[in-house]
């Protein structure tokens, strides 16, 4: 490596193939992480291997096949990672850019080994999650440090734990939204990936997230609360564009149970349709690359039963 430093981009992961067994393998690795499914180990093992994966892999593999088909038989997450890596390698003089997935491939273990073969003076670890969550950024940190600690020589490490307040991130979203006629839409829906309420409650030493009014109160205490960060992201983008706060809705998708962050995206869209507010613009500021959640789950096709004549996905 001619460049003296390494930049490691990390995203969540994707199945190697859109098949039942490949999806099973991905889900098993993902859900076996205690930071993702925070229940006692024996219960987690039973749920993952005998309840969740055997059944969910079947339905999920069908969705991944649909996703692959739309993207020339490849994972969009891998495609975007390769593109980003190539662009940054061309632009950064001092850094050799690598990317890894927290789950599946390319694995953190193999990519860290490739980095260490080049004896870098510094590794900058950049999890591609704008808002901190233990189940994403926290998990990447633990997995990365576990692997790196196996090496005798440990270089300087810089770890980026969240970046949603970075003005360039906000400007990028504002620029993208500016390409739409925002006045033509009844509502602008900011849809973030959901989390169990228990995950955000653990951010606080005392009390619960619900006690903090995280929808409008952003401070030092809740700066790593995913719910607060999500609402804050919406506010920053809304203010950058000079949008009326009443026009913007923050919500959360991909829930597994009712005990996840609310309001739920599907419920919000159903309510908007019922109230005859049918020109909707949807964006997903928790995602830095398209994947199943943005190309399939939020896709307009998913909401045809709502009779929304105009629903645009940013």
Predicted regions and their residues:
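N-terminal glycine-rich anion-binding loop in soluble enzyme alpha/beta folds
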Residues: 3-99
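Long, hydrophobic, well-ordered secondary-structure blocks that form the structural core
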Residues: 98-172
């Amino acid at each position: 490596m001619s460049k003296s430093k390494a930049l490691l981009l990390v995203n969540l992961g994707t199945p190697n193939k859109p098949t039942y067994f490949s999806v099973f393998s991905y889900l098993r690795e993902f859900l076996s992480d205690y930071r993702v499914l925070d229940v006692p180990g024996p219960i987690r093992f039973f749920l993952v291997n005998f309840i969740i994966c055997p059944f969910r892999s079947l339905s999920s593999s069908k969705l991944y096949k649909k996703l692959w088909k739309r993207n020339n038989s490849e994972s969009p997450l891998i495609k975007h990672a390769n593109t980003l890596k190539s662009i940054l390698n061309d632009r950064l003089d001092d850094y050799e850019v690598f990317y890894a997935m927290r789950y599946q491939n390319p694995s953190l273990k193999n990519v860290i080994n490739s980095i260490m073969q080049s004896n870098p003076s510094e590794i900058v670890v950049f999890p591609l999650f704008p808002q901190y969550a233990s189940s994403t950024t926290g998990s990447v940190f633990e997995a990365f440090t576990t692997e790196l600690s196996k090496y005798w020589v440990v270089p300087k490490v810089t770890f980026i734990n969240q970046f949603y307040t970075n003005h360039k991130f906000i400007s990028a979203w504002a620029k993208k939204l500016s390409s739409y006629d925002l006045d033509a839409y009844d509502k602008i829906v900011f849809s973030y990936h959901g989390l169990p309420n228990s995950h955000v409650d653990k951010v606080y030493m005392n009390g619960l997230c619900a006690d903090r009014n995280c929808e409008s109160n952003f401070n030092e205490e809740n700066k790593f609360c995913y719910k607060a960060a999500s609402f804050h992201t919406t506010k920053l983008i809304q203010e950058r564009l000079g949008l009326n706060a009443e026009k913007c809705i923050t919500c959360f998708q991909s829930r597994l149970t009712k005990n996840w962050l609310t309001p739920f995206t599907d419920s919000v869209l159903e309510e908007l349709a019922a109230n005859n507010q049918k020109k909707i613009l949807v964006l997903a500021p928790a995602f830095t690359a398209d994947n199943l959640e943005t190309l399939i789950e939020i896709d307009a096709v998913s909401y045809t039963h709502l009779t929304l004549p105009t629903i645009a996905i940013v």
